[in-house]
Curated annotation (Swiss-Prot):
One GO cellular component term: cytoplasm
CDD domains: UreE (cd00571)
SMART domains associated with the record: UreE_N (SM00988)
Family per record: Belongs to the UreE family.
Protein's name according to its UniProt entry: Urease accessory protein UreE
Purpose: Involved in urease metallocenter assembly. Binds nickel. Probably functions as a nickel donor during metallocenter assembly.
Gene name of the record: ureE
Entry's Gene Ontology BP terms: protein folding; protein-containing complex assembly; urea metabolic process
Amino acid sequence: MVLTEVYRNVDDIPNIGSYHIETAMVKSDDLMKNILRVKTDHGNEYGIRLDNEDQILENGSAFKLGDKQLLVLSVIADEMIEITPRDINEMGLVAHFLGNLHKPVQIKDGKISLLLDKVVIKMLDKHDINYELKKVQLDQPLEYLDLTK
């Protein structure tokens, strides 16, 4: 079966308990794809091909399989670096370095998050920049900064 449209996010579905749910585990970078093949916890395989280019996949994207049946995407947790710069100068240094490495990042609440990378860890340690390693389940894929939007 090929699924072409996201029904809604599982968190936004009323009476979710009345549905039979199959879950497919996906990597965070799979969320950027318009065409995807998944295998569920029930052993079923489905193809996903989004017809609408404006639709995006995210953690919890649900597809209708039947009247009371859903396929829900669940993102596998990634090992992430979460950087907390002390001031604007440190933020600039980190942003410059990550930009030169062409790393996709997520910036939220004054913190920069990116996938685990040993080169980045060495740079952060060398410059005594605060960071934590965390296992994070991303809601949306990390993206490269796009100044055209």
